[in-house]
A protein has these predicted regions:
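Compositionally biased, intrinsically disordered or flexible polar/acidic segments
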Residues: 6, 819-989
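Aromatic- and Gly/Pro-enriched helix-to-coil junctions and flexible linker segments
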Residues: 25-44, 48-55, 59-62, 85-102, ...
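Long amphipathic alpha-helical scaffold segments
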Residues: 75-175
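Conserved beta-propeller blade repeats
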Residues: 133, 183-193, 247-260, 300-315, ...
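Short, conserved, GDST-rich strand-edge loop motifs in beta-rich repeat architectures
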Residues: 135-156, 201-225, 263-279, 316-330, ...
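Beta-propeller blade signature
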Residues: 160-165, 220, 225-235, 278-289, ...
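Multi-bladed beta-propeller domains
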Residues: 169-184, 234-248, 287-301, 336-358, ...
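Loop/turn-rich, solvent-exposed surfaces of beta-rich toroidal or solenoidal domains
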Residues: 365-469
């Protein structure tokens, strides 16, 4: 037995020498080393395996055999057979080794042999019919948000369009651009159909660089300017500028088959409602000289990443909040190049919590109905796992999508028990990991093979971690090229392409006031449980884009109602067969609600559509499954089509966004307050104590998200009625309960309308107009505000629970001792105005004239144990992932003020922070303390640092200001104490 094994060992060693691949022998030592290192890191990061293991070798063989099967189906039999022979031999040797004692490195040799065999096959794919690859050499954008790719001001300088002259790690790289075009930032480009020209976004270098203040709506700055679009020959000659708009971002260009260029732009002047520092971009088109700019889409939160479908439509990602949670807020849409027939093509799966939040960078896979895209987070740099989505499948469920990089999880998603069982056996059951690297910008070569950029780094915002890879759907991945000191982005094969179908322009020349016409064949399709004849009206509503900066910059229009004002445009009749035929105004963001005979909602639409002037379009039913046929219609077709299109019947309370005080409060004044007058001399159970006068404004509670800034106020009557209303609580990840069944929300499901039915509430009877007003308010998702100019700020509501009214005695004593110690060290003529012990107090001593109030930040105790030389007050901190904010009030021009604070890095070395001072509306501000290293206690035992700065005379004259402690580097920002001192200036008030 021993001799037999000895012979086997000898045969194995001979086989290893004999199988040395030609590809590896031809590669230089440096390239071979780079490829092997990449493979080893792939196993470690992606699969948690070592290359010197049986499992790793078998994984390569398994994935390789799946690729071999693809090649055989494609007719590349010779290449497939060659690779199969190599893998079979390696597999046989590998299995023999299970029975013998082997030396370290034996499996690793087989692993690399197998990888080279598969790599050779992958690059032999007939679909790789090009020699050169265009890509962007860049640094990753400055901040971790998917908006950053579309913001020139967020780019880190130093970028170029590059041509990789062969698909090899040691290939020569030819730089297309030169001079000033290489000093700024470059975004996602496109290559012309004849492969001779490149259109690309370029952000020029700013003459005087500033830091980019992410999240600050009033700030303009950065190291680069805004994006503009340029075109250049593939040879780099004669670059020409196509757009020139310093106030807007023009980016993500895409060649259209008719010779025009589509692009993403912020020129509609709209803002993102969850944070109005972000620009809401839409899709536009222009001629190749930059003239004749036309708006294609009506953006709400944004529409971006345009690419062409073979049928001539432009596919893009839409981001919108229309009464739905955060689960699926960025879906795939398509539109004709003239703006007609904008419709969702995939992503309407609210019931599915295991799917990605955003579908980005989608491109159609040649010869199929499928697209490849990134399953990105909302709050990352647009990266995640690679997805394949079938546009011919069910657009409202996960069955039509496939995650082809299963080790990489869907970032930022939340889970709930109600969806786990349903999908426990599906490909989506595995959550995936957040430490397996990140993919972006995939480009499909065939139905199974694609090029993408990938980074091993745990941080998705790695400045220079992204490299180019050849990948397939089976998990095979091979390095094409990795740059040194920069990232690669948006690979495009340099080859000619077949132009998509040209869809005729039916909009140009039409009077822009011409209404569109919509048709619903049978509204009962999709309304399970609703009997024919039950739907009597279709309500047409409008959601409004944000166009002005507000304080707060993110503001709920009610209490979990959502961030967008919305109102009723009108109603139209529904025929007995469920058909509807009606006019709608162009360019508006509209959605619909099916109503019963009493104008109560049966079901609502939770995204929006729009029509172009003169456009005629329609749908089958209400939330009908994708691909549903109209079914049998009466003789001669749908009844509604036998007459002219209905015109909208405006609501009796007038047009405009729904406003509680304008529409509902007058009804309460007429019908309710004679009883519900808020009398205080009665029992709380008495109807009179239920005050519906609406005379008091109170701070709005926040069911999921507080406003980003001071919390808004609502009337007390609004809050009282709200408890009797069934509406969708927007915010957080509440989309897991959607879509809701019919009658699940809105006026038909609300207790308020049931109480008011038929005079059952103390014989109170409402007119039809009053009844409709209250029902419509509920069905607009119960908003309080109807516009951005109406917002009433209540107070600065801290993003944390209030501390106990009376802090523990030891903390009170420590703070008092600290105040006394600080005051005792002040020079003559200097007064301690206010002191705040962060982490314990929200407001400084109320006895003083000057007040410090903390408006954001959470409390934390660094250590309960004493530290020599460190006051107890400095062991308590406030922290925040972005900034800890204080409002200072009670200042006067008669005194000059100094601010001092203490901070330290107790347990996480590497933090860096800065300090900013703003006007209370944040329109004006400046940095008063530059980015500073925090004292490192963990490693160097450095004590807390005391930082001080002067407040300007403008703050003293204004009487108040905002002080923000900002995180520049690290996981969060921290502060222990803050105090203000003053001296008499002799100036008059």
């Amino acid at each position: 037995m021993i001799k037999r094994f000895g012979v086997v060992k000898l045969m194995f060693c001979v086989a290893i020498v004999a199988c040395r691949p030609v590809w590896a022998a031809a590669a230089s030592a440096d390239v071979d080393k780079q490829i092997r290192a990449d493979w080893a890191r792939e196993e470690q990061v992606t699969r948690k395996l070592k290359t010197d293991s049986y499992a790793a070798v078998q994984g390569v063989i398994k994935r390789g055999r799946l690729m071999i099967a693809d090649f055989r189906k494609a007719g590349a039999v010779a290449a497939a057979d060659k690779a199969a022979g190599k893998l079979d031999a390696i597999d046989a040797q590998c299995k023999v080794l299970l029975w013998v004692k082997i030396k370290p490195g034996t499996y690793e040799k087989l692993y690399f042999e197998a990888r080279y065999a598969v790599r050779e096959l992958a690059f032999a794919n007939p679909k790789i019919d090009f020699k050169e690859l265009l890509f962007v050499r860049r640094h990753w954008p400055r901040w971790n948000h998917q908006c950053s790719h579309r913001v020139g001001e967020a780019q880190k300088p130093g970028a170029n369009l590059c041509v990789l002259t062969s698909l090899s790690p040691d290939a020569k790289v030819r730089e297309v651009l030169s001079g000033k075009y290489t000093t700024g930032g470059i975004g996602r480009p496109d290559l012309s159909y004849d492969a001779k020209r490149i259109v690309f976004p370029h952000a020029a270098l700013r003459a005087k660089a500033t830091g980019y203040r992410y999240g600050d709506p009033a700030f303009r700055g950065g190291e680069c300017l805004t994006y503009d679009i340029y075109e250049v020959g593939l040879d780099g000659k004669n670059p020409k500028r196509l757009t020139n708009d310093p106030l807007n971002e023009d980016t993500e260009p895409c060649y259209l088959p008719d010779g025009r260029i589509a692009f993403t732009s912020s020129r509609a002047g709209r803002l993102v409602q969850c944070g109005d520092w972000a620009l809401a971009c839409g899709i536009y088109s222009m001629k190749t000289d930059g003239s004749d700019v036309r708006q294609i889409t009506e953006p709400k939160e944004g529409e971006f990443y345009p690419s062409m479908l073979a049928d001539g439509r432009i596919m893009y990602t839409r981001w919108d909040y229309v009464m739905k949670g955060y689960n699926v807020i960025q879906q795939l849409w398509a539109v004709n190049p003239d703006g007609r027939r904008a419709q969702m093509v995939y992503g309407d799966h609210y019931a599915f919590a295991r799917g990605p939040i955003a579908f980005q960078e989608a491109r159609q896979i040649p010869g199929t109905s499928k697209v490849i895209c990134v399953g990105a987070a909302h709050h990352n740099s647009g990266v995640g796992p690679i997805m394949i989505v079938d546009l011919a499948g069910n657009r409202g469920g996960p069955d039509s999508m496939r995650r082809i990089t299963p080790q990489v999880g869907y970032p930022e998603i939340k889970f709930a028990s109600e969806v786990l069982d349903k999908y426990k056996n599906s490909q989506h059951a595995a959550r995936g990991r957040m430490d397996a690297g990140w993919y972006t910008s995939p480009y499909p070569l065939s139905k199974n093979q694609y090029i993408a950029t990938y980074s091993f780094d745990k941080s998705n915002n790695s400045v220079h971690g992204y490299a180019l890879y050849l990948c397939d759907v089976h998990g095979n991945r091979d390095l094409i090229y990795r740059g040194k000191g920069y990232s690669c982005y948006s690979p495009l094969p340099i080859r000619t392409r077949k132009k998509p179908r040209i869809i005729p322009d039916m909009v140009t020349g039409v009077d822009p006031k011409t209404p569109g016409v919509l048709t619903v064949s049978n509204i009962y399709k999709g309304l399970d449980g609703i009997k024919p004849g039950e739907v009597k009206y279709l309500r047409v509503l409008e959601t409004h884009s944000k166009i002005v900066h507000t304080t707060p910059q993110r503001c709920d229009v009610g209490v979990g109602s959502g961030w967008d004002p919305r109102g009723v445009l009108g109603v139209v009749p529904v025929e007995a067969d469920g058909s509807v035929h009606f006019e709608v105004p162009p360019f508006k963001q509209i959605f619909f609600e099916a109503l019963d005979k009493d104008y109560l909602e049966i079901r609502r639409m939770r995204n929006f559509m729009n029509v172009m002037p003169g456009e005629k379009t329609g749908c089958i039913g209400c939330h009908e499954p994708y691909g549903t046929l109209p079914g049998k219609a009466g003789k001669g077709g749908p009844i509604a089509m036998k007459r002219p299109a209905s015109k909208l019947i405006a609501p009796p309370w007038g047009d405009g966004a729904m406003n509680f005080k304008r529409v509902v409060q007058p009804v309460l004044d007429r019908k309710c307050i004679s009883c519900h007058d808020g009398s205080t001399n009665v029992k709380k159970t008495d109807k009179k104590s239920f005050d519906l006068r609406g005379t008091q404004m109170v701070i709005a509670p926040a069911p999921h998200d507080r406003d980003q800034g001071p919390q808004h106020a609502v009337s007390d009557s609004f809050l009282k009625l709200l408890s009797y209303v069934e509406y969708i609580k927007v915010g957080g990840h509440q989309g897991i309960r959607l879509p809701l069944a019919v009658n699940a929300t809105g006026s038909r499901a609300s207790k308020l309308m049931k109480v008011l039915t038929g005079g059952g509430h103390y014989k109170v009877t409402l007119s039809t107009d009053d009844w409709r007003a209250i029902a419509a308010w509920i069905d607009c998702n119960a908003p309080f505000y109807g516009g951005w100019d109406e917002i009433v700020i209540g107070k600065k509501a801290p993003r944390r629970p209030k501390k106990a009214a009376v802090p523990p005695a030891d903390q009170v004593k420590s703070a008092a001792e600290r105040r006394k110690a600080i005051a005792g060290k002040l020079p003559s003529g200097t007064k301690l105005e206010a002191f705040l012990n962060c982490g314990v107090e929200l407001t400084s001593d109320k006895k003083g004239t000057v007040r410090i109030t903390q408006t954001s930040g959470s409390p934390w105790t660094l250590t309960k144990g004493k530290i020599a030389g460190v006051p107890a007050t400095q062991r308590l901190i406030s922290f925040d992932g972005k900034e800890v904010v204080f409002e200072v009030s009670g200042l006067t021009a008669a005194r000059s003020y100094s601010v001092a604070l203490t901070w330290w890095d107790y347990n996480a070395a590497g933090r860096k922070q800065s300090v900013w001072v703003f006007s209370t509306d944040r329109r004006y501000g400046s940095r008063v303390v530059n980015t500073s290293d925090m004292p490192d206690y963990e490693k160097r035992k450095q004590p807390p640092a005391e930082i001080s700065f002067e407040l300007g005379s403008e703050q003293a004259k204004a009487g108040k200001c905002i002080i923000a402690i900002r995180k520049d580097v690290g996981s969060n920002c921290v502060i222990s104490e803050i105090w203000i001192t003053s001296k008499n200036t002799g100036a008059s008030k």
